[in-house]
Curated annotation (Swiss-Prot):
GO cellular component: cytosol
Protein name as catalogued: UPF0246 protein VV1_0535
UniProt source species: Vibrio vulnificus (strain CMCP6)
InterPro entries in the cross-refs: YaaA
Highest rank taxon of the organism: Bacteria
Any single biological process term in GO: response to hydroperoxide
Family: Belongs to the UPF0246 family.
HAMAP family, A to Z: UPF0246
């Protein structure tokens, strides 16, 4: 199975690296086109477009200016270690071993507004450009139009390379909208994580993001290859609820956290 996750806004380029293996991102020619557009933006443009503070806008204007076509361990780091945030807190990539990284390299992909699709060990320079950003570009008025079929085609290549036709969608709606499911050569299965709150089970964003990361780790660590085995996921108290699940949506619940 191939796992797809969202990226994170929070980045870490400081922590010691737990692996020195790296690969090069494959869609840099596209990233370059977006960087050229982003370099025309003023800090005020960035603040308004991304709905961020002046400080974050300044930081990202600087990142766009400093971005280089050459990706090296000096100006970039592996995507799976650079992304932080709730999904990556659940994934805990910094405690994976070399065999796990090799497995993830084949079975995990990260969607990205700037890089399109990243393998875990692909070098990534720091950026902020969410997929939902309404950035006018040579191909349209937003990033969904910019990426078109490119991400889906890359996913199809990865699906063939890893050996079956199952894609586990652990990405947010904002990011999975960049994928065209009808053009995917795969059965898409979306796990849903619901937490109890005041007697009701619902998707709580913070918990759901972390759970998506935990499930990605569960698949990687246990080399899960069947959907039946995926339903055994029980990290952090989640359990599979068969009667609420369908062939394409797996529902997991958890009792209230105190």
């Amino acid at each position: 199975m191939l796992i797809v996750v969202s990226p994170a806004k929070t980045l870490d380029y400081e922590s010691p690296l737990v692996t020195h293996k790296f690969t090069q991102p494959e869609l840099v020619d596209y990233s370059k086109q977006l960087i050229e557009v982003c370099r025309q933006l003023t800090p005020a443009d960035v603040a308004s477009l991304m709905k961020v503070s002046d400080k974050i806008a300044d930081l990202n204007v600087g990142r766009f200016q400093e971005w280089s076509e050459e990706f090296t361990p000096d100006n970039a780091r592996q995507a799976i270690l650079a992304f932080k945030g709730d999904v990556y807190t659940g994934l805990e990539a910094e405690t994976l071993n070399d065999d796990d990284f090799d497995y993830a390299q084949k079975h995990l992909r990260m969607l990205s507004g700037l890089y399109g699709l990243l393998k875990p060990l692909d070098l990534m320079q720091p950026y902020r450009l969410e997929m939902g950003t309404k950035l006018a570009n040579p191909k349209g008025s937003n990033l969904y139009q910019f990426w078109g079929n490119v991400i889906t085609e890359k996913l199809n290549e990865a699906i063939v390379a890893q050996g079956d036709n199952v894609l586990i969608n652990l990405a947010s709606n904002e990011y999975f909208k960049a994928v065209k499911p009808k053009a995917l050569d795969a059965q898409v299965i979306t796990p849903i994580f619901k937490d109890a709150k005041n007697g009701q089970y619902k998707v709580i964003s913070f918990f759901a993001k972390k759970a998506r990361g935990m499930m990605a780790r569960y698949i990687i660590e246990n080399r899960i290859s069947s959907v039946a085995d995926l339903t055994q996921f029980d990290s952090a108290g989640y359990y599979f609820v068969e009667e609420e699940s369908t062939p394409t949506e797996l529902v997991f619940k958890r009792e209230e956290q105190h």
